[in-house]
Amino acid sequence: FFAAPWSPPAWMKSSEKIIGGTLKKGYEKQLAIYLRKFIEAYERQGIPIYAISTQNEPNFVPDNYPGMQLSAKQQLDLTIATYEEFHNPNKPELYTKIWLNDHNFEDWVNADFILKELKKIGKEYYVSGTAFHNYTNYPASYMSQLYNNHPDHEIIFTEHSEWGISGMYNIQKYFWNWSRSYMYWVTMTTYDL
């Protein structure tokens, strides 16, 4: 299993709601502790979490369901806090991988920025990969651009919906551009199926 939070608790957010807003300044450590507790709770139920992204779709703020915007700098700070919480010497170590971005192809520039900043401070190993969605018309080749800049980091395709047979060609494009996975998002809209 992998996990992607849509929103932290309202008290951590500028909107004071799980819908909208961004992470309050200085709350990165609190959110990292929250993510640790989530992973530990699932593990107690026999469900290990292989990887987690720090935020689902960090560049999109839905107005009618939970979500949160995070700038690339906020994602960087949260990623550092999360890794350091998972590997806190005073707590049991968590081996859950951390994935960046978890958003559309054009957002590869945010992941590139974060990975370059981590490399500058010798912490590029804090992240194992970058997760992508495909809900815009930008090319899957952006995943290859990121891979070419950071070949030691995985590319993971974590979310998309396809209609009809066009989906097969898109899935091929994802793998041609270094994705190690494909996750199909399906929402049931009727009980009549």
Model-derived features with residue positions:
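Substrate-binding cleft and catalytic face of glycoside hydrolase catalytic domains
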Residues: 1-119, 135
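Alpha-helix termination/capping residues and helix-transition junctions
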Residues: 44-46, 120-124, 149, 176
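Glycine/Thr-rich phosphate-binding loops of Rossmann-like dinucleotide-binding domains
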Residues: 62, 140, 192
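Glycoside hydrolase catalytic-domain groove-lining segments
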Residues: 80, 84-98, 124-170
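Mature extracellular/periplasmic domains of secretome proteins
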Residues: 114-120, 146-147, 170-174
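Aromatic/acidic polysaccharide-binding cleft in carbohydrate-active enzymes
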Residues: 157-193
